[in-house]
Structure formats: C-alpha cells, structure tokens
C-alpha cells in the first residue's frame, strides 16, 4: 500500500466562527456530524452519538470551531 492509503488528511474548522462550506466539508467526513437548525445565514453543527446530542455550536459563535473540533476529535465517527 502507498503511504497515502495509511493516512487521511482531515479538514477541521477554524477556532472561531466557520462558514457553511467549511461545515459541509467537515460533516462530509463523519457519520455523526450534521448541519441542523438551518436558518439560511446561520446554522448549527452538531455531533451526535447513537442519536443523543453530544455537542452543538452555532456557526457564528466566537469559539465555535475550537469546541467543535474537540468534540469531533473525541466522538466523531469517520465515514
């Protein structure tokens, strides 16, 4: 196998607010990360485990990406 087959480079979120494009890229990598409460200009990125809410952040919050990255690291299930 090639080295690239052993390692996957995953896209994370910036520490602060994040864009829809960034959220979609992250959610596409995980089976349990979703965009919810979509209001058009703002939305929540959510981590769930067996349907139970683990963490959620509005995309415009100051430290939204920082906390989402931590919970995704600990609870995210790669596709």
Curated annotation (Swiss-Prot):
Pfam family, one: DUF905
Keyword match Hydrolase: no
Keyword Ligase: no
Keywords linked to the UniProt accession: Plasmid
Top-level taxon in the UniProt lineage: Bacteria
Family to which this protein belongs: Belongs to the UPF0401 family.
Protein name (database record): UPF0401 protein YubL
Native source species: Salmonella typhimurium
């Amino acid at each position: 196998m090639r080295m690239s087959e052993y390692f996957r480079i995953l896209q994370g979120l910036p520490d602060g607010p994040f864009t829809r494009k960034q959220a979609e890229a992250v959610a596409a990598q995980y089976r349990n990360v979703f965009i919810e409460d979509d209001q058009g200009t703002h939305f929540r990125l959510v981590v769930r485990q067996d349907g139970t809410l683990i963490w959620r952040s509005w995309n415009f919050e100051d430290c939204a990406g920082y906390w989402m990255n931590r919970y995704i690291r600990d609870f995210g299930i790669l596709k």
